[in-house]
Amino acid sequence: MKPYGKIPDNSIKSLQDLMQLLKKSKDFITLEIASNNSSIVISYFRTLIDVNIFHEEVLTYIKEKSFNSLQDIHSVLPFENSKITNQIEDIQDSILNGYILIQYDTDKLNCLLVNVSKKEKRDITKAEIEYNIVGPQIAFVEDLDVNLNLVRRKLPTPYLQMKELKVGSLSNTTVAIVFIEGIVNDQNLQEIIKRVSQIKTDHVLDSTYLMQLIADNPNSIFPQFLNTERPDRVAAVLAEGKIALFVDGSPYAITLPTTLIDFFSTTEDYTMPWIIASFFRLLRLFAFIFSVLTTPLYVSILTYHYELIPKELLETLIISRSKVPFPPLIEALFLEITIELLREAGARLPTKVGLTVGIVGGIVIGQASVEASLTSNVLIIIVALSALSSFTAPIYRIGNTIRVIRFPFIISAHLLGLLGIVLTSSLLLARLLRTESLRRPYLFPFYPTRPTDWKDSIIRMPISAMFRRPIFSRSKQRFRFNPEEVEKNKILSRNDFDD
């Protein structure tokens, strides 16, 4: 892949040009070894290779034996990922990924590439962002091969297929497109391959970069694709006919296409009885609405609609605001911004310190602001409950969206009261109706209406009732299993018990 921008894209025309450029770097090493009246030149980046393997399994063989050609060296070295080539781009990519370059002085055209790369890996740990009490606990890591291994262990089928693409003219990052052959919709697959192939940028360092580059509408504050750290979640969406993207160096996978409801479901929902899982899903959706609308309703009612408040509650509000010199808008914005500052500070500081700052800071600032008559104690309770409700979102990115859209609602409530809240809600709904994920409607299965997919939306029906794959993914195989066989087995089980 040729670099863009100010980096010259025609400076490397031969192997000699490449070697001259690489030798400018202090960590690029070149060794020369005599063999049968000829010389063998070995070049590599010492920061990219495993030095122990290189000395024990490469240098030892080359120094102890005599060779007459590159093919002789190739046949002796005990490495599978080795090749003889004269392609400059292939040589460049290989050296920069931890290969060593071996040249034989009688062969000026070809060279041998041997993979002795060193990759630093961290151990597989528990999921921290999408933590579950019940169910699998492991999470992805930054190594692409490890992540693909975790998915294959969840779905050990030959129909699980992977395609790899390179993106980023400088980073040359590997992107793996994972799907199940025979279930995935070909149109979806070709569309995502097209989008990834058309990326023109110099670096892609994480899956979040990729999400922005392939989004249907990159200016939307609503996430159009879901990124997850859980292998079980990826396996589940692949079985539905969706697609997963992995970026080398990122501990998160991207699943697509996605609906808004997907951001309020968890893998733990499928480990519970369906009634309990449905209750928690409804609770999360209610918390989403509560978090967005509660503070704007407070501003609206205190600014325009006192008559809507019961007399006893109105007296309490008047007493709590009697010494506050600011209008409800300034009061609400002050507390909301304070909460956001505490969140951001807690997230950036070390875990224990951040937790302390969040708790102590919230208590101290809240108490001090009431005593200083900057805010009312009622609003502190409302803002605290709104913040708490936003934490129920199981996906971090949708939680950020909730935090942002609350502010336009507060301002519109101050300007137009309840009418402003209704207008802002209408504009938000209109925007969501136009939003797409991989050219699929974001509010599916409610718009367009598909009752067959309601079984796993705001509620979750029993798994035995979800024998069809979602229409949304347009999978080739609509049925997960034959429902008649399930019912037949139930009848046989009852008959066996009765006998």
Swiss-Prot record:
Highest taxon above the source species: Bacteria
Disulphide bridges, residue numbers: none
Keywords: Germination, Membrane, Transmembrane, Transmembrane helix
Broad class of where this protein is predominantly found: membrane
Parts of the chain that traverse the membrane: 285-305, 376-396, 409-429
Pfam families xrefs: GerA (PF03323)
Coiled-coil residue spans: none
UniProt GO cellular component terms: membrane
Protein's recorded name: Spore germination protein GerQA
UniProt organism field: Bacillus cereus
Gene name tied to this protein: gerQA
